Design a protein with these regions (language model features):
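Short acidic-aromatic low-complexity motifs
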Residues: 5-26
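A beta-strand edge to alpha-helix "cap/lid" segment located at domain peripheries
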Residues: 56-132
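A solvent-exposed, acidic/Ser-Thr-rich amphipathic alpha-helical stretch
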Residues: 21, 25-71
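A short glycine-/small-residue-rich loop at the edge of a beta-strand within enzyme catalytic domains
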Residues: 2, 14, 39-43
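Basic/polar N-terminal segments that are highly enriched at the extreme N-terminus
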Residues: 1-6, 128-132
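Generic alpha-helical secondary structure signal
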Residues: 2-6, 21, 46, 114
Length: 132
């Protein structure tokens, strides 16, 4: 069994149920997060947790679903679908794990362009709300 497929269970159990406290244990201290709306990588556990928490608030988790997964070695690719304000969002989470099951790289890609615009709008709202 691939290690990534073992590690992903904690992600599913917690993120999909809005439990963001688990991010403190699953994220590596030096994780790098790549947002679909920010060009450069976002470095560190605290900033990655902030962005993933905002994503959880932005991505309409009631309609959010992972529809396909591929795991190989220490890599996972999870395709997701959701609707945000009636705009269909399709994307992938690309996760790289270390040997202990901590996330060291997390990249989110989104399509179509209209969805990217909506994700950007909602992420800004969520980040402002969380930061205040």
């Amino acid at each position: 069994m691939e290690k990534a497929s073992q590690f992903i269970h904690a992600w599913h159990e917690n993120f999909l149920h809005h439990n963001t406290d688990f991010l403190d244990t699953i994220l590596h201290d030096e994780v790098v997060f790549f947002s679909p709306v920010v060009f450069k990588g976002i470095h560190g556990k605290s900033m990655t947790k902030l962005y993933l928490t905002a994503a959880g608030e932005s991505f309409n988790m009631e309609k959010f679903a992972y529809v396909r997964e591929v795991h190989e070695g220490l890599h996972s690719v999870l395709e997701f679908e959701t609707f945000i304000d009636d705009i269909a969002v399709n994307g992938v989470d690309i996760i790289e794990w270390d040997e202990t099951g901590k996330i060291i790289n997390f990249k989110v890609m989104v399509r179509p362009f209209k969805a990217i615009e909506k994700v950007r709008e909602k992420m800004i709202e969520s980040l402002e709300k969380i930061s205040n």
